UniProtKB/Swiss-Prot annotation:
Taxonomic path: Bacteria, Pseudomonadati, Pseudomonadota, Gammaproteobacteria, Pasteurellales
Gene that this sequence comes from: tal
UniProt GO molecular function: transaldolase activity
Entry function: Transaldolase is important for the balance of metabolites in the pentose-phosphate pathway.
Name of the protein this chain belongs to: Transaldolase
Enzyme class: transferase
Main location: cytoplasm
The organism of origin for this protein: Histophilus somni (strain 129Pt)
Length: 317
């Protein structure tokens, strides 16, 4: 009997949205994605204690400055967790740049180069890593620089068509348009509290972005992210990639209802439009209150979890 997870794998690259090694072993995804929140939750698991100890020892050996030690330890911990995941997944790991750098192009570029260097020192080549960066104008510019250096990027916290378009025009390797957080916003800001999967505003957003990319022949990979229910996932069957939390992977594995491909572009590829200017980007992005609020909110939440991670590391120094 074919499960929905098996059926989905036949039309979409399945990625695990977790830092939990045991969950990754269980569901055998192609790739895995992490973020500061997932690194924080993974760090509380007992099997990760040696990775934390190693990161702290590395940081202490590298610098005598306490502030620098903390920065080095959190970078090394994120990479250590990534290295463990890469022992299991055949594809790529996404490791995120500190969200507090989201509005600083040069600092983002420097952090990305540092993370890549840590992976390279451990024998991992660039083609197995994606550097996650928030889809701010500054983050997109950083990704444009990094892509030219052979460092592939995953542009995250993507909520608007303007963000998606700017990423494609910058030659970004992959984007992570969010589904569930868009649904959250509409539930909180409208009278409608329930949405059928096909009417889900997050599903509609990713579908539009997918079709736009295919219509204009952009090579940027579309990886739907942030799911609240299995219905959102099945409505996006056929998307290039989907990154899915273990609880929803479990539901897909336990369901054998037939899965129908929903995303597939069959039209003719058209000539690409002129790239958005910075002012056009901000006008279009800021015309969507949901996108403005969710991008800022996402950056804040990741920054808060980064600070919690720092506090946890400091207690172990």
């Amino acid at each position: 009997m074919t499960t929905q997870l098996d059926a989905l794998r036949n039309m979409t690259v399945v990625v695990a949205d977790t830092g939990d090694i045991d969950a990754i072993k269980k569901y055998q995804p192609q790739d895995a994605t992490t973020n500061p929140s997932l690194i924080l939750s993974a760090s509380s698991l007992p099997q990760y204690a040696p990775l934390i100890d190693e990161a702290i020892a590395y940081a202490k050996a590298k610098s005598a400055d306490k502030t620098q030690q903390l920065i080095d330890a959190e970078d090394k911990l994120a990479v250590n967790i990534g290295l463990e995941i890469l022992k299991i997944v055949p594809g790529r790991i996404s490791t995120e740049v500190d969200a507090r750098l989201s509005y600083d192009t040069q600092a983002t570029v420097e952090k990305a180069r540092k993370l890549i260097a840590l992976y390279n020192e451990a024998g991992i080549s660039n083609d197995r890593i994606l550097i996650k960066i928030a889809s701010t104008w500054q983050g997109i510019r950083a990704a444009e620089i990094l892509e030219k250096e052979g460092i592939n990027c995953n542009l995250t916290l993507l909520f608007s068509e303007a963000q998606a378009r700017a990423c494609a025009e910058a030659g970004v390797y992959l984007i992570s348009p969010f589904v569930g957080r868009i649904l959250d916003w509409y539930k909180a800001n409208s009278d409608k509290k329930e949405y059928a999967p096909a009417e889900d505003p997050g599903v509609i957003s990713v579908t539009k972005i997918y079709n736009y990319y295919k219509q204009y022949g952009y090579n940027t990979v579309v990886m739907g992210a942030s799911f609240r229910n299995v219905g959102e996932i099945t409505e996006l069957a056929g998307c290039d990639r989907l990154t899915i939390a273990p609880a929803l992977l479990k539901e897909l594995q336990e369901n054998s209802t037939a899965l129908v491909r929903k995303l597939e572009f069959k039209g003719e590829v058209q000539a690409k439009p002129q790239p958005l200017t910075e002012s056009q980007f901000y006008w279009q992005h800021n015309s969507d209150p949901m996108a403005v609020e969710k991008l800022a909110d996402g950056i804040r939440k990741f920054a808060i979890d980064q600070e919690k991670l720092e506090k946890m590391l400091l207690e172990k120094f």
